[in-house]
Amino acid sequence: MDEPCEESLPQTRWSLEDAAEVLHQNALKPKFNTLSKLHGGIEFQIYSARDSDDHAIVLKYPDKRWVYNDNDWGIDRFQLLRQECNLLKFAGEHGIPVPEVIAYFAPPDGPEVLVLEQIDVDGTLPSDTEIGETVRKLHGLSPPALYTVAQGNQIASFKVAELTFKRLNVIERLIGDLRWKPTVEELDRLLAPINTDARLLHMDLRPANYLCRHNRLMGLIDWSNALIATPILELARIAEYGGLSPEFATGYQLTSEMSSALDRETGIACRLYTVVMLCVLFLAQLRLVDKAERQISRLKELLGLLGHTSAI
């Protein structure tokens, strides 16, 4: 992704009033005096409200359709929102704690809107053990028969290799020459094991995506980064996020073989996928210098490890 080769598409922007009108057209009428903005991340606007029957609901919609940034170029937010709807339903049907999907509206001329139950939260966090147990349950499921937005119809190893390489190019554009970086072909070869025994991976397991009450996980949200691949890819991300604690390992029933695999070639390449994303996020999108510097240091460490492997 040195310089995006495709022109960005014209953007239509939508307001809260536009989203509320979609609900009104479908006989779901939020009370305007109850609307309250929630943290929506990068892709979506999220509001809590009460409907005409005084039920607490959450509405989630994009204020524009297309994602254009150095991490993701030309991603369709409508597809992301549909994926969120589908994966919340899938996860809920299989015992993963998630908010219930109330409705999904896709009008021809307005924003698509996802309506969810509102889960009351109190600012507490779940234990790492509970997160480990939940992730183990998720990874034990046969994956749904769908293509995720992040992966499309490509095999996991190639898509992860391609995204890693593109983001390495972005990093070089921003900080200068990295001296050495693996090619897409080299990364694809290292990552080939993630194509076997593929499972649904959430790929953004962090406190911002945990809806909690009384230190219990009540809802796992934001499935935008989901992939279908071998769980080592998610475990590597959790490790680089700093979440692979002994308590998580206990809940997940992490074996010594799983743990050691994270420090071999495939595991290092999986870690690299997360670190390049974080580098671009902190360098180009959030512009957080201290965090960017820490991730750049980690990036160089991982590149050094990969550069000395016999598989390259």
Spans of features found by a protein language model:
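Conserved catalytic motifs of the protein kinase core domain
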Residues: 54, 111-112, 196-198, 216
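An alpha-helical support segment within catalytic cores of ATP-dependent transferases
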Residues: 14-30, 141-203, 295, 301, ...
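Residue-level signature of transmembrane alpha-helical entry/exit and packing/kink sites
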Residues: 265-269
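ATP-binding pocket architecture of kinase catalytic cores
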Residues: 36-43, 47-152
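Soluble or luminal CAZymes and related metallo-dependent hydrolases
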Residues: 11-18, 41, 79-83, 127-130, ...
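Phosphate/pyrophosphate-binding loops and the adjoining catalytic core of nucleotide-dependent enzymes
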Residues: 1-13, 310
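Active-site Asp-x-Gly
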Residues: 198-201, 206-207, 211-263
